[in-house]
Amino acid sequence: MIFQPKTLITGANGFIGGALTAKLFARGEVEDAIFLIRSSKPEEGLVRLVNTLRNHGIKTEQLLKLRLEQILCGDLNVVNRWIDDPRLSSIENVVSSAAVASFGNHPSIWPTNVDGVLNMAHGLAHRCKLKRFLHIGTAMACGLDSPNPVPEGYNLGKKTQHFLEYTHSKYEVEQRLKEELPDLPLVIARPSIVVGHTKLGCKPSGSIFWVFRMALALKAFPCALDQKIDVVPVDYCADALYLLLTKPKLKYDSYHISAGEKYSSNFAEIDKSIAKATGLPPLTNYQQKSYEQILLMKDQFKTLLGECNRRIVAKAIKTYGNFSTLELAFDNQRLIEEGMSEPTPLAKYAELCELTSKDISISEQMKFDYK
């Protein structure tokens, strides 16, 4: 008998998708899911997924519940090769998490994040009786000229000035899903900056945490220590996505998963938390410097940051440094209205993130975001 899954999850090997899949394990609800995994055969895909889930704290005895038939081999660049798989005809819910999340100019950003998602959505909408299509975007798709705090559902349209090619692609696919598939039961989740895990630290992924390590190592960054940054842990993000996926009726079709003004930490608070892990005192000689001023330190990058590509470090400082000065917060009242709890501030678990990063160089940790 052909396996008849109810939920398709793409991006389960990614940071957010892996956390959501771990949440399904915790709830005992993984048996009805099928996972799109980039692999040439199911056995290879299963091994990749198992390794990801181990990093999210799933035990071996739980992982034995996964079956080969739950692996759909393929990716968003070759939708035509798997969209007619007979197992997909029973799909009711889709979690669209797969994306090229590189903050460089990766050539696959647009083909994957826009064309691939659209091809998948068209194919599934044609074949399946979908109840929910949960697309994971980014709160940064709001653009540079957003009000602060950024309202949920905010859209400046074609006037949007995008931060990066990645954020532009995530904005574009949202608009085209609405335009091209008006009957799609689309729910958009826009997480803010996702860093670490409240119980596992950076074991699942060191994405973005290296930015804080870099600023502390340089003792300089474009932001002031009293400026706040909107960050959520990946396990909170997974809890929110689970709610948006499973709640029978939702009040809205677009949500931020964010700390908001109330639960955003400032850089001094984050520094104090990290200092507990390093055993060093919090910074007393930090200097707020412009990107250009920090570039004058480039001959010290190797000494302060370890073996690194100075060009990529400079690019990272420009991207994250510019954003850090904006002090953007993303309103999260819609999610709270739906019954979601308040998030844990980064300053409450940054110590654990540092403890689980101490054996990884900053330049190595950067590879999570600069592929």
Q: Where are these predicted regions, by residue range?
A:
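N-terminal Rossmann NAD(P)H-binding glycine-rich loop of SDR-like oxidoreductase domains
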Residues: 7-27
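Amphipathic terminal alpha-helices
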Residues: 27, 34, 318-321, 325-371
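Mid/C-terminal beta-alpha module of Rossmann-like enzyme folds, strongest
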Residues: 244-318, 360-370
